[in-house]
Amino acid sequence: AWLVRRFATTTLPTVASLSTIRAERSEAAVRRNPFAGIGAPVLGVEIAAEEAVPPPGSDFFRGMLSDVSAVRSLPSLPQTGPELRQLAMALGAGEESLHLAGAATEANVKALDLSSTSVVAFATHGLLSGELSGLAEPALVLTPPDAASPDDDGLLTASEIAELRLSSDWVILSACNTAGTDGRPDAEGLSGLARAFLYAGARSILVSHWPVRDDAAARLTTGTLSRIGEDATIGRSQALRQAMLSLMEDENDQSLAHPSAWAPFMVVGEGGH
């Protein structure tokens, strides 16, 4: 806790990646859409996020595609919709910026023009490679279709994310374990979803190291963006640090002072403003 009380920190996948990230600033910055929020997928029973992933033996694939009925059986995340709405409000974005429930599909995400969107946020389940039987790479869970196809089987994988066209200042992943590896035996941390979003064109990403509490994740993401909305000069890492301190010092819920609540998230990439 002493580190976050004194410093705001940012992580880079590699030192060389910093020059690439800064080179990706484009003229699109002057004509940006402020926000796109994707999440609250239509899934099964409601349950706390940290209890949401089925056991590793669950069979989630039929051939190369996911079993959409199995994806649909994943627990729903009722707080993710309100969380994304709060993020939109913090950036002055309207309801049209939100792609929730039935609109939060893999096909819709691939069809969206996100190339001029400043902040893109996903609020859903994050899956590690191998976490479900047959899952060869990390993925984000979206609303599954009636029938799986190569373009949409309910799982937006790291390789599919890398093919998106982004020029976002920030991608926020309000999901579990999004700082994980790409699944190779010798893979390093951040080589999965984080690297995929950087490759797609994000300058910075908010990722998590372990399963996150729904309530804490929502407060951290909305608190971070609210601080940036109030002070355009504040950096992303500093805004996250202040949101973490707010949780740690909450006298109404002392469980939030435990690092398991406030510490999973970190900024990867460009931590400034």
Regions found by a protein language model. Name each.
Residues 1-273:
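Catalytic cores of enzymes
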